[in-house]
Regions:
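Histidine-anchored nucleotide/phosphate-binding helix
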Residues: 1, 102
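Conserved N-terminal subdomain of the carbohydrate kinase-like
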Residues: 2-85
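Glycine- and other small-residue-rich loops at beta-strand/loop junctions that grip anionic moieties
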Residues: 10, 89-91, 112
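Short, charged/polar "capping" segments at the starts of alpha-helices
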Residues: 16-19, 96, 118-121
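Aromatic/hydrophobic pocket-lining residues that form π-stacking "cages" and hydrophobic walls in ligand
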Residues: 21, 99-101
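Structural motif
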Residues: 85-86, 132
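Active-site-adjacent beta->alpha loops and helix N-cap segments on the catalytic face
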Residues: 92-99
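Conserved phosphate/ATP/ADP-binding segment of small-molecule kinases
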Residues: 99, 106-181
Length: 181
C-alpha cells in the first residue's frame, strides 16, 4: 500500500474465506497479526448489484462476526491504535465500538466509510471526531437531511458536514463522479 506499513484489524471466521482473506491480505503487504480469528463463525460476506451508472440497487450481507470487534477487543490494542498515523474504520462495527474508537484515537486522524444509509446514523453525533468521511449520495442525504438531486446540491451538503465539525468530505455521486471538500 504505497510502501507504507499497514495493518488490518478485524474479525474473521476460522473458515476457508477467513483463511483466504488473511493469506491474500498478507501477500499484498498488509499485516494481519491484529486480526481476531473467531472459531465457529463465518467470515463476513457482502454482495451488491449496481445499475449502469454505478448506483447501488440492492445489497445483501452477513456481517454478524463484526460483533466481535468490540471496545474490549480494541482496548487490548490501545497503544497500537494511538500510535497509528491514520485509522480507517467503517460503520459495520457497533455504535458503541465506533464511539470508543473515536474517543480513544487520541490525535490520530480517523477516516470513516459509512457503508450504508442504515448504518451511517451511528456517526451522526460524532462528525467532529472524524477527519475524513466517504459517504455515497444516500448516506450523505441520510446524515445531513439534504436532498442530493444534482451536483449543485453537493456544496450545500459539504457545508452542512463542515459546519458539524467534519474536516474532509469525499462524496461519491455514482455516475456523477466524486465531490471533494
Amino acid at each position: 500500500l504505497l510502501g507504507k506499513n499497514s495493518w488490518l484489524m478485524s474479525a474473521v471466521g476460522d473458515d476457508f474465506y477467513g483463511q483466504s482473506l488473511l493469506a491474500q491480505t498478507t501477500q499484498s503487504g498488509v499485516n494481519v497479526d491484529k486480526c481476531l480469528i473467531v472459531n465457529g463463525e463465518n467470515t463476513s460476506s457482502y454482495l451488491s448489484l449496481l445499475d449502469k451508472t454505478g448506483e447501488m440497487l440492492v445489497a445483501i450481507n452477513d456481517m454478524t462476526i463484526s460483533e466481535h470487534i468490540s471496545a474490549e477487543f480494541l482496548s487490548q490494542h490501545i497503544d497500537f491504535i494511538q500510535g497509528a498515523k491514520v485509522i480507517v474504520a467503517d460503520c459495520n462495527i457497533s455504535e458503541s465500538t465506533l464511539v470508543w474508537l473515536l474517543n480513544n484515537a487520541g490525535k490520530v486522524p480517523v477516516f470513516v466509510d459509512p457503508v450504508s444509509a442504515w448504518k451511517c446514523v451511528k456517526i451522526r453525533e460524532h462528525l467532529a471526531q472524524i477527519h475524513t468521511l466517504k459517504p455515497n449520495r444516500l448516506e450523505a442525504e441520510t446524515l445531513s437531511g439534504i436532498s442530493l438531486s444534482d451536483r449543485n446540491d453537493a456544496e450545500k451538503v459539504a457545508v452542512w458536514f463542515h459546519t458539524h465539525g467534519l474536516n474532509r468530505l469525499v462524496l461519491s455521486m455514482g455516475g456523477d463522479g466524486v465531490y471533494y471538500s
